[in-house]
Amino acid sequence: MSFAPVYSENSHALILGTWPSPKSREMAFYYGHPQNRFWPMMAALTGEPVPAREDIEAKKGIILRHGLALWDTLESCTITGASDASIRDVVPNDIASLLAKAPIEAVFCNGATAYRIYTKYLLPVSGIPAVKLPSTSPANAACRPETLREVWGEALKDYITVSNL
């Protein structure tokens, strides 16, 4: 089973991954692999300190204080290790339930697999076209951290809000 979505009534942009990696499942939260660049990148984009790897509340705070939401495209699947290429038996998450609770205006997919799954299973339900962003996974090491910050920052610039919490 996937993790619960992180969102509030102030979440206007949804960031979607594919499925939690083994390290994320071990940590019981999104992007738990120590080499994943997601949390350092989001901290840089929001002006927040980089949260400690095990500080789930600080990570949730980065998302919630800045008008974002975080979830995965899949509720369940069969996967070998952390290889997105091995994903089969997919069950997509119920995006309609999230959209009924949060005023999501934009969807951003963390990597090509999340984008492909979103487009196939979730776009017909949401009606919101997604933006495919380069994966923050350590498997995408060819994409430098500076490039990730630049591309993600440009995509999210109109959606990252100033904290009022």
Q: Over which residues does each language-model region extend?
A:
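C-terminal capping/extension of enzyme domains
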Residues: 4-12, 33-34, 80-96, 119-165
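Structural motif
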Residues: 12-13, 106
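Short, solvent-exposed loop/turn segments at secondary-structure junctions
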Residues: 20-23, 36, 75-78, 112-115, ...
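Short, surface-exposed acidic-centric catalytic microdomains
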Residues: 23-86
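Short polar/charged helix/loop
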Residues: 50-51, 116, 122
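Internal catalytic-core helix/loop-beta-alpha segment
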Residues: 65-113
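Catalytic phosphate/metal-binding cores of nucleic-acid and nucleotide-processing enzymes, i.e., regions
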Residues: 106, 112-115, 124-129
